[in-house]
Amino acid sequence: MKEKIISEISLDLVFQCNDFSQFSNKLKDTNTHLIFESIFWEKVFLSWINTILKKEDYELPNYIFEKKSFSLGLQIISNQEIASLNKKWMQKNGPTDVLSFPIISDESLNNLDHIELGDIFISLEMALEQSYEYKNSIYREMIWLASHGFLHLLGWEHNNEHDLENMLNFQEYLIKKLD
């Protein structure tokens, strides 16, 4: 049985957020302050982990269903910083909205009780631009980008339209579970 109870799951979140006071006039939506709080993100990721663990029909690595202690990193950074990471690790020029660096593999997890999933980097500037473009709140856009990065940490890829559609639909499902 792949179902687990929320109280059994633990998450160690390493959260870092740069000083974005220069954007304070653009960050006035309801709930925007939450995106800068570690406890908020910890609750979000725990919710998503528990949502995943309560279902058996997701294409995820087996270790996700066998472990109960996870950790991951989330950093909210600038366009300049994410462009540097994008160039160094993805060999792409310019900023992007979200980057994920999973550090797990099935083979290395057999005897581990605690699983380090990896790191997610989100550009606040790109999130702001996209929130205007898609007419979302910055809160919604940050949740969207975090869910996308999180699924990459769990091994999801979108190398074709079908995989991308499945991933985006699953992101929506996870986000709705937060309401």
UniProtKB/Swiss-Prot annotation:
Residues passing through the membrane, by range: none
Residues noted as binding Zn(2+) in the record, renumbered to the chain: H148, H152, H158
Q: What are its E.C. numbers?
A: 3.1.-.-
- Cofactor(s) demanded: Zn(2+)
The subcellular location is: Cytoplasm
Q: Does the keyword Transferase apply?
A: no
What the entry lists under Gene3D superfamilies is as follows: Metalloproteases ('zincins'), catalytic domain
How, per the record, is the cofactor bound? Binds 1 zinc ion.
**Enzyme class, spelled out:** hydrolase
Q: GO MF terms on file?
A: metalloendopeptidase activity; RNA endonuclease activity; zinc ion binding
Keywords on this record? Answer: Cytoplasm, Endonuclease, Hydrolase, Metal-binding, Nuclease, Ribosome biogenesis, rRNA processing, Zinc
Q: Name one GO cellular component term.
A: cytoplasm
Query: What's the short name of a Pfam family annotated to this entry?
Result: YbeY
| One GO process term, biological-process aspect | rRNA processing
**Keyword Cytoplasm in annotation:** yes
Task of the protein: Single strand-specific metallo-endoribonuclease involved in late-stage 70S ribosome quality control and in maturation of the 3' terminus of the 16S rRNA.
Q: Which HAMAP family match?
A: Endoribonucl_YbeY
Family membership noted in the UniProt record: Belongs to the endoribonuclease YbeY family.
Protein name in the entry = Endoribonuclease YbeY
Q: Which organism is it from?
A: Prochlorococcus marinus (strain MIT 9301)
The beginning of the lineage is: Bacteria, Bacillati, Cyanobacteriota, Cyanophyceae, Synechococcales
